[in-house]
A protein has these predicted regions:
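Alpha-helical transmembrane segments of bacterial inner-membrane membrane proteins
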Residues: 1-711
Length: 711
């Protein structure tokens, strides 16, 4: 490697670039192309090393300086401290020039964790939403298993088996079912995780920092957490049916009517508890400070509360439908309504599971729609220029400021160009943290791109140019509790200096936020690093396509020019990409709810065999019976969809004004979309209808004599 123009890279990277051993790479730099000879391959024997080395070329430092045009310059120095860290750190700090920063590895790791903390919490919340819906499904399944054996349990009680033994028996069965189900769930979760990896890494790349995650890493802690969640949720979900099985006397446990009468009494008590849960959820949402976890917990309390309230509301709706429309429905028309009410111990839970999934879907859709509208309006306002140039390149290069300035002057002199603005993306040390900073040289029209979250002072632009002042973006202000008039200490080449905050600007480009400074102000305290972008404002009537083509001829290397419309389109595509993972997990919750409705209807088929046999015996045809069951399932879906609308509104409101503001520091307007509500009702209705097709066919095929046969 001490020989000039030699390099090492991983074998997989070499294969991707079609470079053999001792072959040559051609590096495109700002000035020209530089050849490098690959003299060896780096070992990438495991997933971690493969990801680290995926896009890495290692050379001798002299080769790197020559190729990049940075002779005699370093971008970083890594120091391993032996002992007395604080004393050594202070000594090193005293030696540093104004443009150098001393950062610990621990602080950088903590910064990366903080950047993705809110994103990670929200992903976990979506996963727990699926778990909540699954909890209703587990309750449904275990209740079905208990009800299926009511006669057996009654017989065992008559033979002397105690309540405690019955309770232990049911819990033991649930334990083994939970163990099998959790193991299968973990295996499927690993497969699903591999599929979602690209979606998640794409979102992180778009919002936070660049990662190249291609291999899923599974730790024992993650497997243990999955096992604990699966077993715990099953345990809590099985307690109500287990207690129900032991509560009744041996004689009463033999009668189905005892179950429904007991369920109705329980539903009334649960209705009161659900009110407490909903009120607690709303209180937690708006009285819990800035905690993201409490904000998410409030949504779960609200959803769980409305889920418990669903059977009560279902009974009221069934009474209303029968009372208002009963005279028009006829006998067969009233039967589905009464069947939903009569089997409320089964139908209520299925409707609740479907309602929770659909309300979460409505809430997420309303939130995403509101966010989309807000971002679209922000993009339209924040892209006032007609054309934008991206000027990538190493800011350490001595020639960059001069070449960027020359390019700016050439563009300004082109026919059709009215004015230009410039931007520099850099990082400054603010309050001890490395902070993104955008340095603007504003044209008059550039000022239209700012959306302030406060009444703007007329002197703001003059102060931004001539005084040590900054504008902060809304996320930065939220996360750092910054208000107008406060000062932020920045490390300059002349030492630490307080910059007054004179504005808070709306920004949705990232959730960490950044500082905004005038170029004139910046050059007083820091060295010139050139530009990272130039905005071009065309004269009225100018041919933008022709102007874009002429500017392209002035560009070199990786410099590009794009219209504001192209940037808007790419930004909105990026926005949609960031919510792909949300969409996938949301549909997973809906699928779980669909399985819940299907299992409830299959359970009803078993329990109502004799009842349906009687209907067949008194003259109802197979076709009428199928229609009857389909009407019942459609009614269940319709009820779930109608109840999901107000719950979805509450979920959307908490997501927009509590969870997302605390997570990302953004504020956005609430946009109502009637199409989302209609889609929610249709989703619930169609899901219930599809779930009822197979049970309806099986029930219709049941022979009356077989259905009425008893022991």
């Amino acid at each position: 490697m001490t020989e000039p123009n030699t390099a090492l890279l991983s074998q997989k990277t070499a294969q991707r670039l079609h470079v053999p051993l001792n072959g040559q790479l051609s590096l495109v730099t700002r000035q020209d192309q530089q050849p490098l000879t690959v003299i060896g391959f780096l070992p990438d024997t495991n997933a971690v090393s493969e990801q680290v080395l995926a896009k890495l070329i290692i050379t001798d430092i002299a080769t790197a300086q020559e190729v990049l045009g940075l002779s005699g310059k370093l971008s970083s120095i890594e120091i391993l401290l032996a002992n007395d860290v604080s004393k050594t750190e202070a000594a090193i700090q005293s030696l540093l020039p104004g443009n150098a920063l001393l950062l610990s590895l621990e602080s950088q790791e903590q910064s990366l964790r903080e950047m993705t903390r809110a994103f990670s919490i929200n992903l976990n919340a979506l996963g727990l939403l699926s778990l909540l819906v699954g909890m209703f499904l587990i309750y449904n399944t275990m209740t079905f298993l208990v009800m299926q054996r009511r006669r057996l349990i009654g017989s065992l009680r008559l033979l002397g088996v105690t309540r405690q033994q019955i309770f232990t028996l049911i819990l033991s069965e649930a334990f083994f079912l939970a163990l099998i189900g959790t193991l299968i769930g973990i295996a499927l979760g690993v497969v699903l995780g591999q599929g979602l990896l690209q979606l998640i890494s794409g979102t992180i790349n778009a919002i936070y920092f660049r990662i190249d995650a291609t291999v899923l890493t599974v730790t024992p802690f993650q497997l243990g957490k999955g096992m604990l969640l699966g077993m715990s949720v099953t345990f809590f979900a099985v307690l109500p049916p287990a207690f129900e099985a032991t509560r009744l006397s041996p004689v009463k446990v033999m009668a189905r009517s005892q179950l429904e009468s007991g369920s109705r009494r329980l539903i009334k008590r649960v209705g009161f508890i659900s009110g407490i849960l909903i009120a607690s959820g709303l209180a937690v949402a708006f009285l819990s400070g800035n905690s993201i976890n409490f904000g998410l917990a409030s949504i779960f309390l609200i959803l769980f509360g409305f889920g418990l309230l669903t059977p009560v509301l279902t009974l009221w709706l069934m009474k209303f439908i029968e009372r208002v429309f009963g005279r028009f429905l006829g006998v067969l028309g009233r039967l589905p309504v009464r069947m939903v009410s009569a089997e409320i111990s089964r139908t209520g839970i299925a409707i609740a599971a479907l309602m929770i999934a659909v309300s979460a879907t409505i809430g997420m859709d309303l939130m995403i729609g509101s966010f989309r509208q807000t971002v679209a309006q922000w993009l339209h306002s924040s892209l006032p220029a007609d054309l934008y140039l991206a000027l990538p390149g190493d800011q350490m290069t001595a020639e960059k400021p001069l070449s960027d300035q020359q390019l700016k002057e050439k563009i300004a002199q082109l026919d059709g160009v009215g004015m230009v603005s410039t931007a520099l993306q850099t990082k400054l040390l603010a309050e001890g943290e490395l902070t993104k900073t955008t340095v603007f040289e504003l044209a008059e029209k550039s000022k239209q791109g700012f959306i302030f979250k406060h009444n703007m002072d007329n002197s703001l632009w003059d102060r931004l140019e001539h005084q040590p002042t900054v504008i902060v973006t809304e996320p930065y202000a939220y996360h750092h509790a910054i208000r107008i008039g406060q000062k932020i200490d920045l490390k300059t080449n002349q030492g630490a200096l307080g910059f007054e905050v004179i504005g808070i600007n709306a920004d949705y480009s990232g959730d960490q936020g950044h500082l905004i400074m005038s170029r004139q102000n910046y050059l007083r305290y820091w060295p010139d690093l050139g530009y990272t972008g130039i905005g071009v404002y065309a004269r009225d009537g100018a041919d933008l396509k022709n102007l874009e083509s002429r500017i392209s001829q002035l560009l070199t290397g990786q410099q590009v020019v794009k219209s504001n419309q192209a940037i808007y389109k790419a930004s909105m595509e990026l926005f949609e990409q960031t919510f792909t993972i949300t969409e996938a997990l949301r549909w997973l919750s809906a699928a779980i709810a669909f399985v819940g409705v299907f299992s409830a209807l299959m359970a009803l088929q078993f329990e109502r065999t004799r009842q349906l046999g009687i209907l067949r015996a008194i003259g109802i045809t197979s076709r009428q019976l199928s229609v009857l069951i389909i009407c019942e399932t459609g009614l269940m879906g319709l009820v779930a969809g109608l109840l999901a609308i107000p719950v979805g509104f509450v979920v959307a409101y908490v997501l927009i004004f509590v969870v997302y503001q605390r997570s990302f520091g953004w504020t956005m307007a609430f946009y109502f979309d009637s199409g989302v509500l209609f889609q929610g009702i249709v989703l619930a209705f169609v899901a219930a209808l599809l779930a009822g097709v197979l049970p309806a066919l099986k029930m219709a095929q049941t022979h009356p004599a077989e259905a009425l046969r008893t022991e």
